């Protein structure tokens, strides 16, 4: 099992475009790709899946125990597949205490690191920058760079000359191209399912990467570098039930692949339904999962989805365990106020009203401990990222005691009423990550 980490000195360097192009270009050459994304991001993995035709797992070195990282990598990269993981932020960026960096992930999984460097505003300084990133730790290896946003032949010559003096291989040089940019929304890039020109974008990125990069050298590096260690399966989050109905469409797209895989490994059967298509959960399901997404963009449609609403209430009445995360939590509430102030009725299964008219960013890693064992039976790691505000809340049991990445107590969060529960936290792993 071979693997690469596509990293950068900072966000905005072009990692996603290069990664998508590289994945598709290698796939064209018959390389079996196992896509991955470092960190808790939901949006990039959907692009990776579109580029490769394979599900994309997240690898979060802060929120996941090393044994889970190794187990997931061993699973997806088996059978000769090449694991290509896109990093988050900069190579050495992590939580406030410096933990959970992409470099940590490279060290844990034995991934060769290729740096994508935005060269638009530098020339010879690139050598000092890259050498500093490469030498910062001795337990990882930066094997080369892909230079992005290069302005001219002369600019390229200066960059190559500087990097040659510090013996840093250049695997590719991409010229500036404003056409190859993905649109963004408040939680990051626009979702793959909403990007009508996505296939054309990926094909264009692949053509650029194939023309500008030494794919044979990149593939060779992935092959000869120390391999991703084989690993036995790890303890995983317990399934919500034996037959779990999962909401899946562009309003409920933020669902971790490793979570679904873990539930299946735990013996659960999973079915999918689309609230936006006015579908309810499988009537035989003993658990329902509403993941996060952008329900605020589809609040009117969800409010009017009679079969969805009826099916969810029927599930609650028969005692099925219903769990909503972030956007799913908001939909379980009584109402959702859109950015323009319009209120839409939601399911009314939990006593809260959320609003995007009073925006406030909530962002960070969390450790959560269940207040009782009705839904979950031990401490877990999670991530929170949303702009919604709770503007009304009724009586219900609290779900979690929450602390942040630094261990600061954030109080209790989330609600539970009978078989229905939810919170803004996206659950990632059982506790134990550093």
From Swiss-Prot:
PROSITE patterns: GATASE_COBBQ. This is Hydrogenobyrinate a,c-diamide synthase. NCBIfam families: cobB, PRK01077.1. The keyword Zinc does not apply. Residues 243-434 form the GATase cobBQ-type domain. It catalyses: hydrogenobyrinate + 2 L-glutamine + 2 ATP + 2 H2O = hydrogenobyrinate a,c-diamide + 2 L-glutamate + 2 ADP + 2 phosphate + 2 H(+). Keywords: ATP-binding, Cobalamin biosynthesis, Glutamine amidotransferase, Ligase, Magnesium, Nucleotide-binding. The active site is at residue 326.
